UniProtKB/Swiss-Prot annotation:
Pathway membership, UniProt: Amino-acid biosynthesis; L-arginine biosynthesis; N(2)-acetyl-L-ornithine from L-glutamate: step 3/4
Record keywords, A-Z: Amino-acid biosynthesis, Arginine biosynthesis, Cytoplasm, NADP, Oxidoreductase
Name of the coding gene: argC
Active site positions: 154
One Pfam family this sequence matches: Semialdhyde_dh
Protein's recorded name: N-acetyl-gamma-glutamyl-phosphate reductase
GO biological process: L-arginine biosynthetic process
InterPro entries, sorted: AGPR_AS, AGPR_type-1, NAD(P)-bd_dom_sf, NAGSA_dehydrogenase, Semialdehyde_DH_NAD-bd
Role noted for this protein: Catalyzes the NADPH-dependent reduction of N-acetyl-5-glutamyl phosphate to yield N-acetyl-L-glutamate 5-semialdehyde.
Amino-acid biosynthesis found in the keyword field: yes
Enzyme nomenclature, EC number: 1.2.1.38
């Protein structure tokens, strides 16, 4: 049984982690923590997230020193802000824990990336080198040996799952950059109150145009440039990405389908559509990424959907943990 600590459990992704870990037959929750300054400290997780009433009634404990919580802990999930994960991950690693970080603090092995896109100076370049990128369907072998797993961002997960098989099969004309138009539910912005996310203010609109930090994350791990435009959707959760690409001359619809099938035939959390394209409603609340596509001449439109809090965060983190410790990949997820 793996003793498991969830840090930042009060947020949306944190609560989903609690749900998955609680029903995992090989994991035991040792504590749920929040920052020492959090207004949620001392409250029950089920008071903040009533779906957990009668299931998990643990308190959210304030954490100011990891030594209060790290003894005897095997696994730590960090559902914390980027700067917080940056500071906490090295301490938990030093304490002998395997760390799964849901923030962006260790996703790209380039310290200058963090100054430019995250606004802080990265102090641990050696950990950037050691961290395994947790795109579970593609990085499984690295995950099996890693002690620090950087869980990909929500947008990058869907984008890479859609594009990587086609790039690896050399089917795309990358002189024309793939264009990713992505829309996410408001939960992607977290639980903290903000006027722009309030019911009467939220509106479908693009943001971070040409400046969003997920663009370089996607491009770095794909090994190909992309144009990425995220949009805020006026719905609670889920991500839908419509990706426009140019195929190399002579590439057929059958070749596209074959590349996707070969990549995901034995990957249970990626569901491929033989006909049509996926809808958001079919993945919300589920740990899958659904992918469908259409071809017209040399033009390809590929659509990927996922729940931003699940396959885009908590479910992928647990999927990575399952791979790391040799459990069934879908254990506790489906």
């Amino acid at each position: 049984m793996l003793n498991t600590l969830i840090v930042g459990a009060s947020g949306y992704a944190g609560a989903e982690l609690v749900t998955y870990v609680n029903r995992h037959p090989h994991m035991n929750i040792t504590a749920l923590t929040v920052s020492a300054q959090s207004n949620d400290a001392g409250k029950l997780i089920s008071d903040l997230h009533p779906q957990l009433k009668g299931i998990v009634e643990l308190p959210l404990q304030p954490m100011s020193d990891i030594s209060e919580f790290s003894p005897g802990v095997d696994v730590v999930f960090l559902a914390t802000a980027h700067e917080v994960s940056h500071d906490l991950a090295p301490q938990f690693l030093e304490a002998g824990c395997v760390v799964f970080d849901l923030s962006g603090a260790f996703r790209v092995n380039d310290a200058t990336f963090y100054e430019k896109y995250y606004g802080f100076t990265h102090q641990y370049p050696e950990l950037l080198e050691q961290a395994a990128y947790g795109l579970a369907e593609w990085c499984g072998n690295k995950l099996k040996e890693a002690n620090l797993i950087a869980v990909p961002g929500c947008y990058p997960t869907a984008a890479q799952l859609a594009l990587k098989p086609l790039i690896d099969a050399d089917l795309l004309d990358l002189n024309q950059w793939p264009v990713i138009n992505a829309t996410s539910g408001v939960s992607g912005a977290g639980r903290k109150a903000a006027i722009s996310n309030s019911f009467c203010e939220v509106s479908l609109q693009p943001y971070g145009v040409f400046t969003h930090r997920h663009q370089p994350e996607i491009a770095t791990h794909l090994g190909a440039d992309v144009i990425f435009t995220p949009h805020l959707g006026n719905f609670p959760r889920g991500i839908l990405e419509t990706i426009t690409c140019r195929l190399k001359s002579g590439v057929t619809q059958a070749q596209v389908a074959q590349a996707l099938q070969q990549a995901y035939a034995h990957k249970p959390l990626v569901r491929l559509y033989d006909k049509g394209v996926p809808a958001l409603k079919n993945v919300v609340g589920l740990p899958f990424c659904d992918i469908g596509f259409a071809v017209q001449g040399e033009h390809l439109i590929i659509v990927a959907t996922e729940d931003n809090l699940l396959k885009g965060a908590a479910a992928q983190a647990v999927q990575c943990a399952n791979i790391r410790f040799g459990y069934a990949e879908t254990q506790s997820l489906i």
